[in-house]
Design a protein with these regions (language model features):
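Cell-envelope/glycan interface and biosynthesis
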Residues: 1-127
Length: 127
């Protein structure tokens, strides 16, 4: 079962429908996990973006620093989460859930093993 329905609130309606489809498939295949994140405000994204970065790195929008646990590479307004077009999945069967999500049409992001997003989302929001 793929739990975490509170994170469906605020998703773009077609995205929400696709996540419910993923949940149904997860149930059929007895996959365990949860939606750990969905829609994020710019403030929530800024907080996550700041984790693992110095103030100078945030100003310069440094994406990675070796040996530091950076949570996201997307500053506020540049994440699919800010538009209700992404979810993060975690749990025992995370890898299988991400593979299943990709098989039913979600886009995945290299280097972010928990992330599923609406394919082509940037064109929907004008980025």
């Amino acid at each position: 079962m793929l739990s975490g329905t509170s994170y469906l609130y605020g998703l773009w309606p077609p995205m929400m429908e696709a996540v419910r489809y993923l949940q149904a498939y997860a149930s059929v295949y007895s996959l365990e996990g949860r939606i750990a994140s969905g829609l994020r405000s710019n403030q929530e994204q800024a907080t996550l973006y700041a984790q693992g970065r110095t103030a100078d790195e945030i100003r310069r929008q440094v994406s990675k620093r070796i040996g530091v646990d950076v949570v996201t590479n997307a500053p506020p307004g540049r994440s699919a989460h800010n538009y209700g077009l992404a979810v993060d999945v975690e749990g025992r069967d995370q890898t299988k859930l991400i593979q299943l999500g990709a098989a039913i049409g979600f886009a995945t992001v290299s280097g972010d093993p928990a992330h599923l997003e609406w394919p082509g989302w940037r064109s929907l929001v004008g980025l």
